[in-house]
């Protein structure tokens, strides 16, 4: 289970007394390694320093649309990287939890308490949907479990966001998953922690007095989307809010949540590494502990020593380094000691553990990619094919994250379009820019800056290097400038123009210079303001020589 799988991370050392006191409690890091490798790769690719958003123009391009797309891109990157300080740590934490649980959620909404848009990470255990739901889109009920400090609750009541009712002393409780996570972190709650548990229900209701009316102005009986917030202990309703636009004739539900999946599961929730390689991690841990225990017993042998025929504490197992008294008749000193025949750690068990670990690493795509160790004379596409074959799992996961981030940016743009003033100026480094609320329309598509087909810098460099090799193999058919520029971009070089000056634009030349270029295999170009008749006469005369 997910709860037991958290122990396989090895964050907490287990003090064991079986099979002997002080037996190894080490945990093999194959699962922790896979999680951190994925988190570091995804974080770097999906959240670059310049911002995660790029835009593209929908429909026929024009200068107005291009300017609009540029404004949207700059503003959203500015908001995410500067004005929303919680975005980076929340995204970072989400990427660490995602490969463990298999599912993670982001909640995008306008926070009344701080007066701006936020995008918060929601663990899978804090979001509940009906059993029959297969996605957020077809779930008729979505319940979000919210832990809120008493002071924050009072602020929202005073602001009028929640109904000002007496809630009493909060009775905070934790589920098994939260307790396990706190145990791994080494933290605990106290009785002084005043935290309310709220249940925010995104439901469909047919409320009396607010019925859906048909063309004849009679109730249709159709349920409409609402958000109902209830305090868990007192079960008092704190708020009921409409969850659709008044102008929308279809009265469609507004979306607030984005589902990130590591791997598709059998139902609503996705599968994570605990589900897929948890058994391998447990097997590797058991083998590792047996090898360490065998080494301990071999290095610190135990046995018996003679002292009569009775054995003291014969019911207790021997400990490493222990020589227990044995009541026996006298004799030679060599005969007074008996070392138990502990074997060295099994090489077969060691090899088996290596195979188990390799299987887990291969599945999680964290095995070292020996790209530089291949045959340098191999075909150009061979290395790329090997790289792609060894990383199919990571590539598919990256595409799922790309799709979820695209939906997250769409929800963010909807919030900006709703709450921004008609024109919103903001300061940036070296100047001032502005955005319009009307810029967030269907003419601009907002997508992640990451390439869904490329998930690591290693892959990006290898593809650029392959393209450069092909261009150098036949320079006459390729643009070497573009090939070298792509290589520098893959390497992450910032000042490319200083290393690779742009190709100079062709300028008008006199006929004699054009003759020299033709002889050297260079192309020539005609310009509008040239004397074309004189040029043609000169070229014909040159061809006749």
Tell where the protein language model's regions lie, with residue ranges.
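Extended, helix-rich architectural segments
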Residues: 1-245, 313-315, 345-348, 352-355, ...
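Generic recognition of stable, solvent-exposed alpha-helical segments in well-folded globular domains
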Residues: 67, 71, 251, 255, ...
């Amino acid at each position: 289970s997910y709860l037991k799988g958290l122990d396989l991370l090895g964050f907490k050392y287990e003090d064991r007394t079986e099979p002997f006191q002080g037996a190894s409690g080490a945990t093999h890091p194959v699962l922790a390694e896979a999680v951190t490798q994925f988190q570091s790769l995804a974080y770097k690719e999906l959240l670059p320093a310049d911002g995660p958003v790029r835009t593209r123009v929908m429909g026929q391009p024009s200068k107005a649309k291009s300017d609009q797309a540029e404004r949207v891109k700059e503003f959203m990157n500015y908001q995410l990287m500067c004005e929303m300080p919680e975005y980076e740590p929340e995204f970072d934490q989400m990427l660490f939890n995602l490969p463990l649980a298999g599912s993670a959620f982001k909640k995008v909404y306008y926070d009344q308490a701080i007066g701006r848009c936020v995008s918060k990470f929601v663990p899978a255990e804090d979001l509940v949907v009906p059993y029959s739901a297969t996605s957020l889109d077809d779930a008729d009920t979505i319940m979000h479990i919210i832990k809120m400090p008493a002071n924050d609750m009072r602020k929202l009541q005073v602001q009028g966001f929640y109904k000002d009712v007496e809630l009493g002393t909060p009775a905070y409780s934790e589920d098994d998953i939260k307790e396990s996570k706190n145990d791994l972190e080494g933290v605990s709650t106290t009785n002084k922690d005043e935290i309310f548990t709220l249940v925010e229900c995104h439901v469909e209701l047919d409320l009396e007095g607010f019925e859906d009316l048909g063309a004849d102005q009679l109730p249709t009986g159709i349920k409409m989307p609402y958000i109902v917030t209830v305090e868990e202990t007192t079960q008092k309703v704190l708020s009921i809010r409409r969850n659709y636009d008044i102008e929308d004739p279809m009265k469609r539900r507004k979306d607030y949540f984005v589902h990130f999946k590591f791997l598709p599961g059998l139902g609503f929730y996705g599968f994570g590494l605990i589900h897929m390689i948890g058994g391998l991690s447990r097997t590797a841990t058991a083998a590792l502990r047996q090898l360490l225990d065998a080494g301990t017993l071999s290095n610190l042998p135990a046995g018996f020593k003679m002292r009569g025929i009775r054995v003291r504490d014969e019911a207790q197992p021997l400990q490493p380094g222990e020589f227990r008294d044995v009541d026996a008749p006298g004799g030679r000193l060599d005969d007074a000691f008996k070392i138990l025949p502990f074997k060295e750690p099994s090489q077969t068990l060691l090899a088996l553990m290596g195979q188990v670990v390799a299987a887990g690493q291969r599945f999680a795509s964290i095995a070292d990619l020996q790209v530089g160790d291949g045959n340098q004379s191999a075909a150009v596409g061979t290395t790329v094919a090997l790289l792609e074959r060894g990383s199919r799992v990571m590539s598919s996961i990256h595409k799922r994250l790309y799709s979820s981030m695209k939906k997250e940016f769409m929800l963010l743009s909807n919030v900006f379009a709703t709450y921004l003033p008609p024109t919103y100026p903001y300061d940036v480094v070296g100047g001032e820019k502005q955005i319009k609320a009307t810029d967030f329309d269907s003419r601009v598509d907002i997508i992640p800056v990451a390439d869904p087909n490329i998930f690591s810098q290693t892959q990006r460099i290898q593809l650029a290097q392959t393209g450069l090799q092909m261009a150098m193999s036949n320079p006459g058919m390729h643009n070497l400038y573009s090939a070298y520029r792509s290589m520098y971009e893959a390497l992450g070089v910032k000042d490319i123009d200083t290393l690779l000056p742009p190709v100079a634009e062709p300028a008008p030349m006199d006929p004699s210079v054009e003759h020299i270029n033709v002889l050297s295999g260079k192309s020539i170009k005609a310009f509008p303001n040239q004397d074309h008749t004189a040029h043609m006469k000169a070229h014909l005369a040159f061809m006749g020589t």
